[in-house]
A protein has these predicted regions:
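Active-site hotspot residues in diverse enzymes, especially metal/ion-binding acidic/histidine motifs
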Residues: 1-138
Length: 138
């Protein structure tokens, strides 16, 4: 996977969703692409069968392309949830089919770059991982 592919996809999302500041609003981005976003707790009340499928698949987040639902575990740290949500958006942006390790790496790289692009880290004058985590809510 080329860095240029990840950067180009990130810039496309920023432009299409008019992202102008950080931290990005993850749920707003997902809604822009037509997803309904629920916590696992909300999903359990709404559709227990889908909730059980989510829990069997991932403890972090789950995307159901058939229903247009993305759910995430509200009990995880907020930064982890944000990463998981943008990871799922990465699968959408790259039209991934299946869970190959390549697809997972690509979605991870996309999520990282979207949440805290290198250039934004530079211009935010981050001097430590703690600075990055604080400014970009990771």
């Amino acid at each position: 996977m080329a860095d240029t592919k990840i950067i180009a996809a990130t810039l496309e999302v920023f432009q299409e969703c008019e992202v102008r500041s950080f931290p990005v609003d993850c749920c707003s981005l997902l809604r822009h692409y037509g997803y309904k976003v629920y916590t696992y707790k909300e999903l359990k009340m709404k559709n227990n069968e889908l909730y059980e499928m989510c829990m069997g698949y991932s403890d972090d987040a789950f995307q159901d392309g058939c229903t247009g639902i993305i759910a995430y575990n509200q009990d995880k740290p907020a930064g982890r949830s944000r990463f998981s949500l943008m990871h799922e958006l990465g699968h959408h942006v790259f039209a991934h089919v299946g869970n190959s390790s390549r697809n997972e790496r690509e979605a991870n790289a996309f999520a990282s770059n979207l949440l805290a692009p290198r250039m934004a880290i530079h211009y935010a004058h981050c001097h430590s991982a703690s600075d990055v985590a604080h400014i970009f809510e990771l």
